[in-house]
Amino acid sequence: MPGFFSAAIGVTVDAPERLCFNHAVETDAYIALGSNLGDRELNLLRAVAEVGKLPESKVTALSSFYETSPVGVVAQKAFYNAVLRLSTGLDATTLLRRLLRIEDEAFKRVRTVAQGPRTIDLDLLLYGSAVINGETIVVPHPRLTERRFVLQPLCEIAPEVIHPLTGKKACEHLAALNSNETVVKL
């Protein structure tokens, strides 16, 4: 999907083989995006643009947008969700810090209620095949295999990606998921 959304947000999605960075190692990271406050579609588009501006990084795939039922705190507006693949030279901790900075600075996100409403939520799902259990970072995302609103868009762009802890493909986790979440492709 090269050029996808480029006119709307100023970011192009190039084929991975066309990427060229000034560093030795690129890693494919998968990032979930979610919004249920304000203009949800515009928030996702803006977030893709902001992530696409990260140094040593390029958005190489973007799923469709999905309208999804809230999980946890259910008395809130439905979410729009998507997943993108980012080819990056940033290490996982730096990438996560940059994602949190986008939430805070570009979207003025204030965390008041866990799983509550938000203008944008950016979660680092996978960072290559890395398994990281740090004080400030856990990769793969600990609830990745439990969430249809993440697995469905992930499977759209990377059905064969392997979860480094389970050894299973994303599409296998989606097929095995027993969830009552509503996930509708827009």
Located regions from the model:
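Flexible, gly/pro- and Lys/Arg-enriched active-site loops
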Residues: 63, 71-78, 90-97, 101-186
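Short, surface-exposed acidic-centric catalytic microdomains
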Residues: 46, 51-91
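Aromatic (phenylalanine/tyrosine) cluster motif
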Residues: 4-5, 21
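Extreme N-terminal starter segment of soluble prokaryotic enzymes
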Residues: 26-30
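Short, positively charged and aromatic/hydrophobic N-terminal segments
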Residues: 12, 21-22
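Short beta-strand-to-loop capping motifs
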Residues: 35, 84-88, 128
